[in-house]
């Protein structure tokens, strides 16, 4: 299972199930095999801060 940190603003926003952006302090489980991303709370193992299919980045002009 891959976790990435989610923040309310910045370059590391995760679009998760229901098109919800994870709030600050939450983790995003990147979906695999057709599964949707899910927001979770609590501790997780952060994944590498790389450009993966499950990542979502806002263009800077919208920050």
Swiss-Prot record:
The modification Sulfotyrosine is found at residue 62. The keyword Mitochondrion does not apply. One of its GO terms (cellular component) is extracellular region. It is found in: Secreted. Residues 39-63 are annotated as: Disordered. The keyword Glycoprotein applies. SUPFAM superfamilies: Leech antihemostatic proteins. Disulfide bonds join 6-14, 16-28, 22-39. Residues 1-3 are annotated as: Interaction with thrombin active site. One of its GO terms (molecular function) is serine-type endopeptidase inhibitor activity. Residues 55-63 are annotated as: Interaction with fibrinogen-binding exosite of thrombin. It holds the Pfam family Hirudin. Belongs to the protease inhibitor I14 (hirudin) family. Hirudin is a potent thrombin-specific protease inhibitor. It forms a stable non-covalent complex with alpha-thrombin, thereby abolishing its ability to cleave fibrinogen. This is Hirudin. The lineage of its organism: Eukaryota, Metazoa, Spiralia, Lophotrochozoa, Annelida.
């Amino acid at each position: 299972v891959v976790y990435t940190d989610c923040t309310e603003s910045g370059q590391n926003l995760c679009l998760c199930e229901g098109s919800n952006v994870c709030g600050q302090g939450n983790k995003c489980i990147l979906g695999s095999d057709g599964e949707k991303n899910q927001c979770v709370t609590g501790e997780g193992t952060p994944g590498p801060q790389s450009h993966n299919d499950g990542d979502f980045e806002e263009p800077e002009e919208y920050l």
